[in-house]
Amino acid sequence: MADQTTLSPALLDYARSVALREDGLLRELHDMTAQLPGGRAMQIMPEEAQFLGLLIRLVGARRVLEIGTFTGYSTLCMARALPAGGRIVTCDISDKWPGIGAPFWQRAGVDGLIDLRIGDAARTLAELRERDGDGAFDLVFVDADKAGYLHYYEQALALVRPGGLVAIDNTLFFGRVADPAADDPDTVAVRTLNDLLRDDERVDIALLTVADGITLARRRE
């Protein structure tokens, strides 16, 4: 989520000055998204999207699944990181927000690598499992409605190959997960997933305090 970080503004500016590789096309999409109602709260921070691209290269991912497209900034970053023959399936409940990012995918020359699925994510994931079978993806990125996180995680774990990676965004959720008084459904859902991940022996995990928290879960072989 945009600007959701524990770093001071000065330290964030410094980190970006020495490590962020956001070109003009990405910046244009980032700025356009920030102008949307709720856009700054919903869009991924650029350094986190860059990190996802690095993960794709580190894992050697050729088949990537993204649950939650929004305006497609992270989609673009991940598509650019794919090797020859790679492909990303990204799904969203509506074509309203992905429609903003699609022209940027075209301008970047990666639109042919992106398979956008519109509709309920639970149904899309079921269709992918039926069509492609379990273990069809090398990396899955989860960044959708928090109420569905438990279901998305279980589906992602089935769809990712042994040794593959599931990356889950917003696992610190504006700090509300650490507030016992925060009992809204979204916070409870994220907190419940975090508890499950801690004890899940099917995966190796690390929760990184990048942006709003991103948990990496490697499916054990």
UniProtKB/Swiss-Prot annotation:
It is an enzyme of class 2 (transferase). Belongs to the class I-like SAM-binding methyltransferase superfamily. Cation-dependent O-methyltransferase family. This is O-methyltransferase MdmC. InterPro entries: Cation-dep_OMT (IPR050362), SAM-dependent_MTases_sf (IPR029063), SAM_O-MeTrfase (IPR002935). Gene3D superfamilies: Vaccinia Virus protein VP39 (3.40.50.150). 4-O-methyltransferase for the lactone ring of midecamycin and other macrolide antibiotics. A divalent metal cation binds at residues 143, 169-170. The gene is mdmC. S-adenosyl-L-methionine binds at residues 44, 66, 68-69, 74, 92-93, 121, 145. It comes from Streptomyces mycarofaciens.
